[in-house]
Design a protein with these regions (language model features):
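Sensor-1/coupling segment of RecA-like P-loop NTPase cores
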Residues: 1-7, 142
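Conserved nucleotide-binding/hydrolysis micro-motifs of P-loop NTPases
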Residues: 1-3, 22-27, 155, 175
């Protein structure tokens, strides 16, 4: 529907847009509460008997159902390779007139390394060699493709909140580890 804007326009009031995020660990494990909820409830240790290797495996597997279906790390890597190639080549070409298709994979790698940190456009511009206006356009496109998310700064003071830098996250921890 999004690729045919005239169709989306004609469905006004008859469609709903849902953002589907990768699965959370509680969804993957079919648990009613999240790990954070159980940690605060004080019953974390008894319910999650996994060790460091299990934890790393869970993180690198991510939350995309298709990636989770692949049991071996090699097959998951192949899925992530294919997923990123499809999005960064075909979908980008369909959505925008971008001349720097070759720059997007490297930009995504740099953003993955900075995931969870404050977004510093000047430093990112120096690291990539891209102008800040180009970076903003590319990052907007990566957000539309649900690969990254910018989380606004938080402060109880509205003025400070508007001045602070947002944090940047990749949409999936398996994608970030890839």
């Amino acid at each position: 529907v999004w690729l045919l804007p005239e169709m989306a326009d004609s469905l006004g009031g008859r469609m709903e847009v849902l953002e589907l995020w990768p699965l959370a660990q509680c969804e993957i494990a079919a648990r009613p509460r999240s790990i954070v909820d159980e940690l605060f409830a004080g019953d974390f240790a008894d319910r999650y008997p996994f060790d460091r290797d299990d934890f790393i495996e869970r993180l690198t597997a991510g939350g995309y159902p298709e990636a989770l279906e692949r049991r071996s790390g090699r097959r998951r890597q192949a899925w992530f390779d294919s997923y990123l190639a499809t999005i960064l080549q075909r979908d980008v070409r369909d959505l925008a007139q971008i001349e720097g298709l070759t720059e997007l994979p490297r930009l995504l790698q740099l953003l993955a390394a900075r995931s969870g940190g404050l977004l510093n456009m000047a430093e990112l511009s120096r690291s990539t060699g891209l102008a800040q206006t180009t970076l903003r356009r590319y990052m907007g496109l990566l957000e539309v493709l649900f690969l990254i998310r910018q989380v606004p700064a938080w402060s109880s003071n509205l003025g400070k909140r508007l001045q602070k830098s947002p944090k940047l996250f990749l949409s999936d921890y398996g994608l970030m580890a890839h």
